[in-house]
Design a protein with these regions (language model features):
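C-terminal beta-strand edge segments of enzyme domains
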Residues: 11, 76-146
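Active-site catalytic loop in hydrolytic enzyme cores
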Residues: 1-39, 47-48, 52-62, 124-128
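Conserved acidic residues
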Residues: 42
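Short secondary-structure boundary segments
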Residues: 48-49, 74-76
Length: 146
């Protein structure tokens, strides 16, 4: 059912948007969201086979806010073997507002309008900026830890 991928953290241009891609369990790791945001992603697409009820759906808005990106989490529904997938797909804006929340066990399609400038504006306040205020030297230790 599940195995790690080897495609890295891709971003690609589609019309005037930069789209990043995370898959399933990737959502759990804050670093990958930040990398995609730093690569210029306006929207992060997150296809998933989530099986822990509500956990990702609670965390996804946090990742949207802390990276100022739109997130589209498309989660599977139904059961296969012993696994039941939790549905509840989400579209979240760059300020963490849930724009669409699908049901847990029913196929759902939604269309929302987004303003890409909301993702491109990384100012938190007139004094605070998500990228300019980063201190990468403080996280160097993280890279050397097992």
């Amino acid at each position: 059912y599940f195995c790690p991928g080897d495609n890295g953290l891709p971003v690609f241009q589609r019309q005037n948007a930069v789209i990043g891609l995370l898959v399933c369990y990737d959502w759990f790791f804050a670093e990958v969201w930040k990398i995609l945001a730093l690569k210029g992603a306006d929207i992060i697409c997150h296809p998933s086979n989530l099986i822990l009820p509500g956990l990702a759906q609670q965390g996804i808005p946090f990742h949207a806010v802390t990276n100022r990106v739109f997130i589209v989490t498309a989660n599977r529904i139904g059961t296969e073997g012993s696994l039941t997938f939790t549905g509840n797909s989400l579209i979240v804006d760059a300020r963490g507002e849930v724009l669409s929340h699908a049901p847990a066990a029913k196929a759902h399609v939604d269309v929302v309008s987004i303003d890409l400038e909301r993702a491109r504006d990384k100012a938190v306040t007139f004094r605070n900026h998500l990228f300019e205020d980063r201190r990468p030297q403080d996280y160097e230790e993280l890279l050397s830890m097992p």
